[in-house]
């Protein structure tokens, strides 16, 4: 593994990054409604970056566009990447991190097309807030690269119209479109499992075509890149999901 996204997945859409910095004994315990658990916030931004340095992985950071927005994203970027002399850069320094992290890649939300997502949005709603958020973030740090949310899965009812509308609204500020895809295991046999690679190829081909259409529409010289930042074999039975909250904190944080 060379790259890890933080805070990852559905968790981020209700996450307040300020809860995960500073003295651990003062960090609040919060309900994590995405995964129906208690989040202790004992592992936050600075702990993640210490881990990333030790393991030599490249970080991708994600901002909350589910319950928060432009201002919060700007503050988080300032905390991580601005040198000193401002409220949030000096907050980072007060937490024992003198030098800015210089986080290069940032995701603008996570799977905002999904009805399961806290703060779920239409393509139009998401496209607008992502474009404005990206614009402000690049005013703070012009060297960052931004990843906008594509369809959560190629099986979504709104695919690929979602991707087209989001790119239409964000093409000028976005550098990558996120692709997420999970496949079932071998319940239907090895041949069926392996054949799913054909579906993935078709998924990528379709999204490339969508991006080319928007590029031509915008008369842009920029080629949109793609970030496959969630993928794997889905092994969690659907009947395990319920509305009960586990009052015991996760032993492994769902933020990773």
Kindly label every feature range from the protein language model.
Residues 28, 70-99, 115-225, 232-256:
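Non-catalytic scaffold segments within catalytic domains of secreted glycoside hydrolases
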Residues 61-64, 120-121:
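Second-shell loop/turn segments in exported
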Residues 31, 54-59, 143-144:
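Short, surface-exposed connector motifs at secondary-structure boundaries
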Residues 2-6, 59-62, 104-108, 145-148, ...:
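Structural recognition of the beta-strand scaffold that forms the well-ordered cores
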Residues 4-25, 46, 64-80, 153-155:
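Aromatic-lined carbohydrate-binding surfaces of glycoside hydrolases
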Residues 10-45, 50, 54, 86-116, ...:
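Aromatic- and acidic-residue-enriched carbohydrate-binding clefts of CAZyme catalytic domains
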Residues 45, 53, 69, 122-123:
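General structural signal for secondary-structure boundaries
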């Amino acid at each position: 593994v060379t790259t890890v996204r933080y805070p990852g997945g559905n968790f981020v859409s209700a996450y307040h990054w300020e809860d995960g910095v500073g003295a651990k004994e003062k960090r609040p315990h919060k309900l994590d409604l995405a995964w129906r658990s208690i989040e202790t916030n004992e592992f936050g931004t600075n702990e993640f970056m210490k881990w990333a340095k030790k393991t030599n992985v490249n970080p991708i950071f994600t901002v909350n566009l589910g319950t928060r927005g432009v201002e919060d994203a700007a503050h988080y970027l300032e905390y991580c990447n601005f040198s000193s002399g401002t409220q949030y850069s000096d907050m980072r320094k007060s937490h024992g991190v003198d030098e800015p992290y210089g986080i290069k890649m940032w995701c603008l939300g996570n799977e905002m097309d999904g009805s399961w997502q806290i703060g779920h949005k239409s393509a139009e709603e998401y496209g607008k807030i992502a474009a404005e958020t990206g614009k402000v973030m690049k005013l703070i740090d012009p060297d960052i690269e931004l990843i906008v949310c594509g369809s959560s899965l190629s099986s979504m009812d709104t695919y690929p119209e979602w991707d087209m509308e989001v790119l239409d609204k964000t093409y000028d500020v976005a550098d990558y479109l996120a692709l997420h895809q999970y496949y079932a295991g071998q319940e239907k046999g090895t041949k069926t499992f392996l054949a799913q690679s054909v579906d993935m190829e078709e998924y990528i081909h379709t999204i490339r075509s969508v991006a080319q259409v928007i590029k031509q529409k915008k008369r842009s010289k920029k080629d949109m890149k793609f970030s496959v930042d969630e993928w794997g074999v889905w092994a969690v039975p659907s009947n395990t999901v319920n509305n009960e909250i586990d009052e015991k904190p996760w032993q492994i944080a769902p933020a990773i």
